[in-house]
A protein has these predicted regions:
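Juxtamembrane/disordered regions of integral membrane proteins
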Residues: 2-175
């Protein structure tokens, strides 16, 4: 949707959200929390079945703490924070998508996975490799040095996150 705005002597069409577009913080928080619970459950199930994982929150927490219990606690905090933050991103992007809530979530999950694998995994594993002076911890693009299973497990988890976020947030917002 576009609106016209006068700036000095010029009038331009400026893209903006529809007038009825409002973000409900409680809905974003609850749907983000639920989607984070879903991705966590999928990750734990895949781990239980012996599928390799890309666990960025744990990688980040290991950069700051060394006690194994604190690593897990900090990693869980980072994981939850990221899940809630990306729910806000979805709330901002979702009105621009023109598909069903589940399809919007699926698209968001794929894009999120691609960004994590193309930017997050190589960057954070490179930082860890530099800090530890150990090249063996570098995971590579799309976790290529961890095997295809790690990237596919991450894809499955992010699809579950995206679809659950899309279904819960999208359907409730459209009511």
């Amino acid at each position: 949707m576009e609106t016209t705005r006068s700036i000095g002597s010029t009038t331009r069409a400026v893209p903006c959200a529809p007038a009825s577009f409002r973000i409900d913080p409680a809905l974003v928080f609850s749907s983000g929390f639920l989607a984070t619970l879903v991705i966590t459950t999928v990750m734990l199930l895949l781990l239980w079945f012996g599928v390799a994982q890309v666990d960025l929150p744990i990688w980040v927490s290991r950069l700051f703490v060394s006690d194994p219990v604190k690593v897990q606690a900090v990693g869980l905090g980072i994981h939850l924070t990221m899940g809630l933050a990306f729910a806000w991103v979805f709330a901002l992007v979702e009105p621009q998508l023109r598909f069903s809530p589940s399809q919007n979530g699926l698209i968001f999950g794929v894009v999120l996975w691609a960004m994590v694998q193309a930017i997050g995994v190589p960057t954070l594993s490179a930082v860890a490799a530099l800090i530890r002076a150990d090249d063996s911890v570098f995971a590579g693009w799309f976790a290529s040095r961890l095997g295809v299973g790690a990237a596919m497990a991450s894809l499955v988890a992010h699809l579950a996150y995206g679809v659950s976020l899309g279904v819960v947030y999208g359907r409730q917002r459209n009511r």
